[in-house]
Regions:
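Extreme N-terminal leader/targeting segments of oxidoreductases
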Residues: 2-56, 72-81
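Core beta-strand elements of the Rossmann-like FAD/NAD(P) dinucleotide-binding domain
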Residues: 53-55, 261-271
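Active-site substrate-recognition segment that forms the wall
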Residues: 71-72, 102-104, 126, 134-143, ...
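Glycine-rich FAD pyrophosphate-binding loop
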Residues: 74-97
Length: 463
C-alpha cells in the first residue's frame, strides 16, 4: 500500500526547497587519507570557522541514521540539494562503545523490519561499492538462533511462518537438537528454537559509521560541530489544518545552534530531519512538540536506555565455543555471541521497554547462569556501557513527518535496530524528501500519527 502524504506536506517541501536554494557554499571534500580521517573522527572535527546559515535539508544528529540520510540525499541529488548535519558530539563518544549493535537479523514479526534487514544486509555486503574501498566493516555472515520457552513456542512458530512468506530461509529446532549442536547451552527449559543463515551476521559498527560520515562529506555534506538550542517560527494565518485552530499555525523555518565559540547562529532550512537518538525528545520539545496545544500536545516518546555489555573468558572451564556459534537470542532477553576467533563470548540483555526496580545486573546474571551453566568458573567482566534510543510507546521506530510540523521528519526510537537498519532507514527518509513518498520499502506505518490515534505497532518477538 503506497504511503499517503498530504498535499500540504508536498507543496511546502517543494516550495521551501526552492526558496532555500541560495545557501552558503561550505563543503568538506574528501582530501585526507583513511587513517587521518579516522583520527579526526576520534578526536573531533577541526575548529570550524565557516558556519552555514542556509541549507535545503538540515539533519540534527550525525550518527548512523543521520549520516545515512545525508549519504542517500547527496547520492541521489548531488549538488542539487544542500545538506547540513548538526552534531554536538563529533568525537562520537556515545558511539565508541557499540559492541552489541553490530549484528543483523531477519527474526522479526513486522514485515517492515524484515524488509529493512534484507535491504541493509545487501548494503553491508557491498559496503565498499557504496562507500569506499577503504571501508572495512569486518562483516562476518553467520546465523541467528532464537530460543523460545513453552510460553513463547507458538509465537515463534507464527513468526517463522511469516518470515518464510517474505523469503527468509530458516529452520525450527527442538530443544534436544539445539543441545546436540551446542552442548554448552542448557536447553531443558527450551521448547523450540529457530536458526537462519542467510543475510545475517555481525560487523564492526564503528567502521560503518566512519564510512558513512566520510562518504557523506565527500559528496558535499557539511558537518557542523554545534548544539541545537531552538527553532524560529513564522505565522501562517492562512493555513488551515485539521486539529489546529484557524489562524494559529506557526511554521518552523529556522533553527538556532550554538558553536564551540558560544556564538548563536540561525540556519534557514526547508526540511529538518531529527535523527538525534536519545536527544530526540529534547529537540522535539524545542519545536513545542509535547508542550503546545492541539496536535502539539503529544510528546515524542523516546527515552535513553543504558545497559552493560559483558565478556566471558573461557580459559578456565575448557569449554570450546565453536567457530560456527550463531548469534543467540534467549527467551529471557539475554543475547550471546562469539567474539571473533577468540574462545570467548560477549553478551548482555536487551534493554527493557519499561524501567523496573530490579537491577539489570541481577537479571543478567540469573539469565546467563541458567542458559550457560558452564560460565560459573569463567571470568565475567563489563567491557562497555552502551545506550539506545527507546520508543517507550511501542518499542518500534518513529519515522516520517510530524502531523503539525510537516517539514520536520523524525527518524528515531529504533533502539539497537537503528544501527543495522540505518542504510535502509536513511534511504527511506531521502525518498520522502525527494519523492514525497516511500519507494523502496513502505514504512508509512512507522509514522508519528500512530501515537496520536493510539494505534501501537508492536514487534511481537519471543524475548
Amino acid at each position: 500500500m503506497a504511503m499517503n502524504i498530504s498535499n500540504f506536506f508536498i507543496k511546502n517541501i517543494q516550495k521551501s526547497i526552492k526558496f532555500s536554494r541560495q545557501y552558503a557554499k561550505s563543503t568538506h571534500p574528501f582530501t585526507k587519507t583513511w587513517s587521518l580521517i579516522n583520527e579526526e573522527i576520534k578526536s573531533g572535527f577541526k575548529q570550524q570557522t565557516d558556519y552555514p546559515q542556509h541549507a535545503d535539508v538540515v539533519i540534527i544528529g550525525g550518527g548512523f541514521i543521520g549520516s545515512s540520510v545525508a549519504y542517500w540525499l547527496k547520492t541521489r541529488a548531488g549538488e542539487g540539494l544542500s545538506v547540513a548535519v548538526i552534531e554536538k558530539d563529533t568525537a562520537y563518544e556515545m558511539s565508541q562503545n557499540i559492541n552489541s549493535h553490530g549484528f543483523i537479523t531477519q527474526h522479526y514479526s513486522l514485515p517492515e523490519n524484515i524488509y529493512l534487514s534484507q535491504y541493509s544486509a545487501e548494503f553491508l555486503r557491498n559496503v565498499k561499492t557504496h562507500l569506499n574501498e577503504n571501508v572495512d566493516i569486518e562483516y562476518s555472515p553467520h546465523g541467528t538462533l532464537i530460543l523460545a520457552s513453552e510460553k513463547y513456542a507458538h509465537k515463534l512458530e507464527e513468526n517463522v511462518a511469516l518470515q518464510r512468506e517474505y523469503g527468509v530461509k530458516n529452520k525450527i529446532l527442538t530443544g534436544e537438537e539445539i543441545q546436540k549442536m551446542y552442548p554448552w547451552l542448557k536447553t531443558s527449559d527450551i521448547k523450540l528454537g529457530c536458526i537462519s543463515a542467510e543475510s545475517e551476521g555481525v560487523f564492526n559498527a564503528h567502521n560503518l559509521l566512519k564510512g558513512l560520515i566520510l562518504k557523506s562529506k565527500e559528496l558535499g555534506t557539511t558537518y557542523v560541530k554545534s548544539e541545537v538550542i531552538g527553532f524560529e517560527m513564522e505565522s501562517q494565518r492562512d493555513v488551515l489544518m485539521e486539529g489546529v485552530k484557524p489562524g494559529s499555525f506557526n511554521r518552523i523555518n529556522r533553527l538556532l545552534y550554538r558553536t564551540e565559540d558560544n556564538e548563536e547562529i540561525s540556519l534557514r532550512f526547508a526540511v529538518c530531519v531529527v535523527a538525534a537518538g536519545t536527544d530526540s525528545t529534547h529537540i522535539a520539545e524545542l519545536a513545542n512538540i509535547g508542550r503546545g496545544s492541539d496536535l502539539l500536545t503529544v510528546p515524542l516518546p523516546v527515552e535513553k536506555r543504558t545497559y552493560n555489555v559483558y565478556s566471558i573468558e573461557n580459559e578456565a572451564n575448557k569449554m570450546s565455543i565453536g567457530l560456527n556459534t550463531p548469534y543467540i537470542m534467549d527467551t529471557s532477553g539475554l543475547w550471546l555471541r562469539r567474539n571473533g576467533i577468540q574462545n570467548n563470548l560477549i553478551c548482555g540483555l536487551v534493554p527493557p521497554l519499561k524501567v523496573t526496580d530490579i537491577p539489570d545486573s541481577d537479571i543478567f546474571h540469573s539469565s546467563l547462569h541458567n542458559r550457560y551453566p558452564g560460565c560459573g568458573e569463567s571470568k565475567i567482566q563489563t567491557i562497555s556501557t552502551e545506550y539506545s534510543d527507546c520508543n517507550t510507546y511501542d518499542d518500534t521506530g518513529i519515522l516520517g513527518p510530524h502531523p503539525y510540523h510537516t517539514n520536520m521528519i523524525f527518524a528515531t526510537g529504533f533502539s539497537r535496530q537503528g544501527v543495522h537498519h540505518s542504510p535502509a532507514i536513511g534511504k527511506g527518509v531521502a525518498e520522502l524528501i525527494i519523492d514525497c513518498q516511500y519507494s523502496t520499502i513502505d514504512l508509512s506505518r512507522f509514522g508519528f500519527d500512530r501515537i496520536l490515534i493510539d494505534e501501537p505497532l508492536i514487534e511481537f518477538n519471543v524475548y
